[in-house]
A protein has these predicted regions:
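Active-site-proximal or metal-binding-adjacent scaffold patches in catalytic folds
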Residues: 1-60, 69-109
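Walker B catalytic acidic pair
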Residues: 65
């Protein structure tokens, strides 16, 4: 699918750029988050709905989750990583936060 192709392109780019590597990644529908990760297992999950967003937003979420592999909270050290590698990350975050996540009835089943 489109998201898998885009992640296959951009995840290695950001891993190489930051030196932060995930063990694996998966996509799934999420109703409250664009991405999540498990720093212990170094696994990343990306919201399937990112396929419908501008590529810059996908790159931001990939970088955001990779940064969590090093820093677990959203404090100054975390934002410094984002600032270093993506100076306009706040704009991409705002763009995502201003958009909606789709509700899928099947999520209740």
């Amino acid at each position: 699918n489109l998201l898998k192709r885009e992640v296959a392109k951009y995840l290695p780019k950001w891993e190489k750029t930051t030196g932060l590597y995930c063990s694996s990644w998966q996509s799934k529908y999420m109703t409250t988050k664009w991405g999540t990760c498990n720093p212990t297992s170094k696994k990343i999950w990306l919201n399937l709905q990112l396929a419908k967003k501008p590529i810059e937003c996908l790159e931001y979420v990939v970088l955001h989750e990779l940064a969590h592999l090093k820093v677990h909270d959203h404090g100054p050290e975390f934002t410094a990583i984002l600032d270093q590698y993506m100076p306009y990350w706040r704009e991409h975050k705002r763009r995502l936060n201003d958009s909606t996540l789709d509700y899928l009835p099947s999520q209740l089943e």
